[in-house]
């Protein structure tokens, strides 16, 4: 399953005809198993110059799926004849794929940061040793500092990465509940952008939300009760989509973000303002000016098609400006785009158009940009790290 983006096919899910066809690696790797992500899981067995991505296993959220995952790993391992010496896994200790990895008998276990793996998957597909500048935009992934990342610009080779820039984080009031009840995301973003006094009465989104719920959500954020911070670009799609579409709930992963993408006016070229804070490390892409302007457009009853298009254009402009500053400080390196947000054709094609012809940009093609391609990145990172041990 996939679509055409920027004139080339991009796979979203590898299945019959692609699995278990090997992906050719530019450099040989030791025998290893990369266990993949928690959502949209695939795993990867690799040895020499061949990497074999397993089939789409789905979300490892119940015992039946986990049992199927374990059987499929064993089946493909027998089929390709690989006895892994290294087991690679995500940093997140609660992922079932991580727990499976840590329970295996092999002694060499290597944890790979989620967004480094996203970038490395595209590097592996295109034979890039690095350094590259990787743009990894998705919903969430555990960062090396213990917070939720997902709006990242990294300077990376296969063994190392440096976090150069990130999106300003959004508080998730209620944790994962905020990803389902997206009005919570919107409220947190609005309070941050408007210094606690957003124009809620002018937004249809909040007309059906009880005042008590709003007050409780604000108290959770103020007192930091079960309210982790999330840097994910996907959370901005959810929050702005909630505001612009008056969508209080997301009934499946990415629902509001996809609706927000689909309504965008293809002909709209305007954008909102943004700021880039370069005083610390990482730099922070601050979209609060955009949030304020987009919200007032919604209050003034400007249609969601225009607001969505301007949101997309602003995220593209902020990313491109950051990449230009990165190049000034770190030199000219290839740019890699990865993460689930780059399944969004408008975002991807617009960013490519903005960066051309000054940047060499690489997209995933035969490996999904989302978590379905993560295991390939885990595999090549783990091999590179193991060679330094």
Model-inferred region functions:
Residues 34-67, 71-75, 188-333, 345-353:
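A contiguous, well-structured pocket-lining segment that forms one wall/lid of small-molecule binding clefts
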Residues 116-137, 141-143, 182-191, 238, ...:
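Glycine-rich phosphate-binding/hydrolytic loop that grips phosphoryl groups
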Residues 32-34, 88, 132-136, 230, ...:
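Short glycine-aspartate micro-motif
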Residues 1-3, 41-46, 135, 151-155, ...:
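Short beta-strand scaffold segments in enzyme catalytic cores
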Residues 90, 107-118, 333-338, 345, ...:
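Conserved phosphate-binding/catalytic loops in two-lobed NTP-binding clefts
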Residues 81-93, 330-341:
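Short glycine-rich phosphate-binding loop at a beta-alpha junction
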Residues 163-176, 201, 220-225, 360-365:
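Short beta-alpha connecting loops at secondary-structure transitions
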Residues 1-26:
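Internal gly/pro-rich beta-alpha loop/helix module
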């Amino acid at each position: 399953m996939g679509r055409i983006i920027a004139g080339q096919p991009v796979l979203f899910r590898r299945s019959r005809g692609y699995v278990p066809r090997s992906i050719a690696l530019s450099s040989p790797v030791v025998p290893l198993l990369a266990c993949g992500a928690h959502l949209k899981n695939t795993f990867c067995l690799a040895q020499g110059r061949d990497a074999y991505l397993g089939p789409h296993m789905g979300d490892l959220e119940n015992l039946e799926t986990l049992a199927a995952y374990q059987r499929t790993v064993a089946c493909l391992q027998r089929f390709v004849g690989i006895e892994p010496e290294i087991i690679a896994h995500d940093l997140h200790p609660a992922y079932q794929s991580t727990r499976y990895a840590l329970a295996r008998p092999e002694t060499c276990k290597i944890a790979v940061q989620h967004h480094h793996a996203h970038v490395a998957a595209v590097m592996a597909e295109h034979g890039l040793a690095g350094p590259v500048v990787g743009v990894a935009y998705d919903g969430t992934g555990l960062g090396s500092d213990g917070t939720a990342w997902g709006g990242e610009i990294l300077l990376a080779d296969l063994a190392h990465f440096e976090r150069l820039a990130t999106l300003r984080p959004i508080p998730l009031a209620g944790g994962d509940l905020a990803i389902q009840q997206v009005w919570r995301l919107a409220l947190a973003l609005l309070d941050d952008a408007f210094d606690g006094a957003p124009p809620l009465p002018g937004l249809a989104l909040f007309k059906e939300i009880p005042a008590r719920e709003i007050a409780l959500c604000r108290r959770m954020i103020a007192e930091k009760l079960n309210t982790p911070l999330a840097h994910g670009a996907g959370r901005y799609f959810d929050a702005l989509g909630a505001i612009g579409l008056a969508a209080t709930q997301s009934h499946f992963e990415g629902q509001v973000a996809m609706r927000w993408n689909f309504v965008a006016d293809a002909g709209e070229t305007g954008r909102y303002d943004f700021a880039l804070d370069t005083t610390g490390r990482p730099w922070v892409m601050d979209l609060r000016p955009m949030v304020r302007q987009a919200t007032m457009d919604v209050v003034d009853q400007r249609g969601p098609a225009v607001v969505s298009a301007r949101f997309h254009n602003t995220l593209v402009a902020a990313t491109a400006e950051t990449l230009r500053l990165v190049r000034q400080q770190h030199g000219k390196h290839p740019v890699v785009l990865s993460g689930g947000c780059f399944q969004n054709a408008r975002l991807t094609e617009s960013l490519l158009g903005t960066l051309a012809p000054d940047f060499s940009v690489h997209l995933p093609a035969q490996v999904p940009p989302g978590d379905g391609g993560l295991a390939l990145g885990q595999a090549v990172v783990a091999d590179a790290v193991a060679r330094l041990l």
